[in-house]
Amino acid sequence: MADILDSRPHAFSIKLWPPSLPTRKALIERITNNFSSKTIFTEKYGSLTKDQATENAKRIEDIAFSTANQQFEREPDGDGGSAVQLYAKECSKLILEVLKKGPVAKVAARELISEDSVSPRETFFDISKGKRAFIEAEEAEELLKPLKEPGNAYTKICFSNRSFGLGAARVAEPILASLKDQLKEVDLSDFVAGRPELEALEVMNIFSDALQGSILSSLNLSDNALGEKGVRAFGALLKSLSSLEELYLMNDGISKEAAQAVSELIPSTENLRVLHFHNNMTGDEGALAIAEVVKRSPLLENFRCSSTRVGSKGGIALSEALEHCTHMEKLDLRDNMFGTEAGVSLSKTLSSFKHMTELYLSYLNLEDEGAIAIVNALKESASPIEVLEMAGNDITVEAASAIAACVAAKQDLNKLNLSENELKDEGCVQIANCIEEGHSKLQYIDMSTNYIRRAGARALAHVVVKKEAFKLLNIDGNIISEEGIEELKEIFKKSPELLGALDENDPDGEEDDDDEEDEEDEENEGNGNGELESKLKNLEVNQED
């Protein structure tokens, strides 16, 4: 039997930290009871009111948790036992301090705990305020002093808006190296502005080497004109990031080659939740590389690839890659050259999303076919859309009924932007009709520059002015008659702030096709009984259950 049974102890890895949310809540309740119930301590020092007890209990637990968590982060390979002990010790110490203060008036409850002894230590170090300027060695020595203090608790640093030279970078190097076990968020955006290329690249190398091996959750390298050379200068750091959750590479000159370098140098994207590539020259080939990063990021929630010169080929690649990102909440692809085919491809992806709240698809050349495919997909999806932007896509009245059906289905909608299209009166009235019932959260509508006349503007105004949460209607840049403008002002008489400026409206303007209504007939509609408006009001929105 002894040969069969191995009596040696087996190694189990049980993590004791962090405590679960229910555990933390239970501790807060116990602390509250210690303050307000009859105990030997409250008999000696006095008890607190229920409100005072609750307020202080929450504060004590939060401070103790923060202190213990910092301890745990310094020894990530441990089981968390020391953090648990520190958590309990801090709570006990702070509870006793509060009790010794004795009961005080409620107005002074926030001062029960000594600020010197329990205030959380500063965790965010930021030098970005003030004027944009070069920083050299001497100033860096003085500016970065707080980071050298023993036992500091900084987990987030921002060096943005200050241009580091070689001297300043060498001052920062050992300081950053000493902090890399505690840093979680690093913002190095716009930190080499105006430096010669060779110096800037060397500065990047220094920072990369200093931070290599950090357990960062967020890295911002935006506004540095990186290009491929800059991306590779940060190669050591990028390769070492195994827990990265947020990466920002905006306005960085990310070309095809730079995008390929990003894909190559970031091997671990399993935890990536936020990825921003706004305002780069990525193009279709670069988009293919970015698509590979997206494919490897199943937890991605927030993806921005706006103003990146991506055409149909790249748009289709990104759309297909996004199918792997079922947690997507915010998607921004504005200002690219997707076209109809990429729009249809994107619609297939959108139909599977369940958590999407913000969707920015303006200026993508979607046209009616792409727009209809997208809104039909959204209508059928479970996504609780709050923001929908499809401005500047050459959308005409042909797509209006599909858009209206989608909007009608999305009762969480907060903002709708359909500006710079060609929806005209008919499309505008369909949008107005679909939001007449419900949509209690709706705050902003932008239908500017849509060849809208008096009838469409009036229909929309009558609907939104009744919504309690509504804040702004933008219908500027249209062709509303002078009488129509006066009517709008009358509708918004009690709340003029809800109607945006009408400086760009052209009362004498004309539609660019042969189907326009004669302005004279429109003005003769009187109280809205004209034939056009009568027909529009009877339009139905086909909404499936």
Swiss-Prot record:
Signal peptide feature range: none
Q: Per its UniProt record, what SUPFAM superfamilies does this chain match?
A: RNI-like
Q: Does the keyword Membrane apply?
A: yes
Which Gene Ontology biological process is one annotated for this entry?
nucleocytoplasmic transport
Instruction: Write one Gene Ontology MF term.
Output: GTPase activator activity
Localization annotation: Cytoplasm; Nucleus membrane; Cytoplasm, Cytoskeleton, Spindle; Cytoplasm, Cytoskeleton, Phragmoplast
Mention any one GO cellular component term assigned to this protein in its UniProt record: nuclear membrane
Q: Give the record's keywords alphabetically.
A: Cytoplasm, Cytoskeleton, GTPase activation, Leucine-rich repeat, Membrane, Nucleus, Repeat
Repeat region (LRR), residues: 213-236, 241-264, 269-296, 325-348, 353-380, 382-405, 410-433, 439-462, 467-494
- InterPro entries in alphabetical order: Leu-rich_rpt (IPR001611), LRR_dom_sf (IPR032675), RanGAP1/2 (IPR045203), WPP_dom (IPR025265), WPP_sf (IPR038214)
Its membrane topology is listed as: Peripheral membrane protein
Region named Disordered: 496-545
On subunit structure and binding partners, the annotation says: Homodimer. Interacts with WIP1 and WIP2 through its WPP domain. Component of Ran complexes at least composed of WIT1 or WIT2, RANGAP1 or RANGAP2, and WIP1 or WIP2 or WIP3. Interacts with WIT1.
Q: Which family does it belong to?
A: Belongs to the RNA1 family.
**Protein name stated in the entry:** RAN GTPase-activating protein 2
Q: What is the lineage of its organism?
A: Eukaryota, Viridiplantae, Streptophyta, Embryophyta, Tracheophyta
